Amino acid sequence: VLSNIIANQDVHEKYGGVVPELASRAHQVNIIPVVDMALKNAGISIKDLDAIAYTRGPGLLGSLLVGGSFAKSLSLSLNIPLIEVNHMQAHLLAHFIEDNCDVKTDFPFLGVNISGGHTQIVYCRNYFDMEIIGETLDDSIGEAFDKCGKMLGLKYPAGPKINKLANEGNENKFNFSKPKVDGLNFSFSGLKTNFKRFLEKNLKNDKFFIE
């Protein structure tokens, strides 16, 4: 990997979550500067590219359209191949990028995708043959983290902040319901609702409970 540039979208912070329309607009503003910086950091020119890979999905439609349109236009102008990528599959294969990785993985293997939009257990037979054998039936774990964080008054994204606070706290002080789901699937909406009621009950008795 010669360069890896990320443009943060702080515009979502005051809304406590990703706003699709704002995300796509931010993509439009950032995509050219991000590509320019990636090329500069890699020490190459745009004419040195041999192919272009882009996220075909899944994701927010507006943001996908911005990225896809830019990638297709650049591919046509440079007359180089365009490679569509399912970014959830790419997450599972990302560890193959590192040649000096301490832990070597070979096929078949089980992978877990955990993100703001997905929670999946995936059986990977090879680079192109993958099967989801377990997934969330409602909210993803990342979504549950962010929504619970919003209830606590934490800024988006709340997940890392909740994790930090949890590591500093007493894990046995409170008990929450554990979802009962068949097979290898997950469910987090019940836990989120349980947490909401827990906060409402305790704040009713003590308005400084969260403090």
Regions found by a protein language model. Give the residues of each.
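N-terminal beta-alpha supersecondary unit
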Residues: 1-58, 87, 91
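A short glycine/serine-rich beta->alpha loop
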Residues: 16-22, 54-61, 132-136, 179-183
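A short helix-loop
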Residues: 103-107, 112-114, 120-209
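Conserved phosphate-binding catalytic cores of ATP/NTP-utilizing and phosphoryl-transfer enzymes
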Residues: 85-109
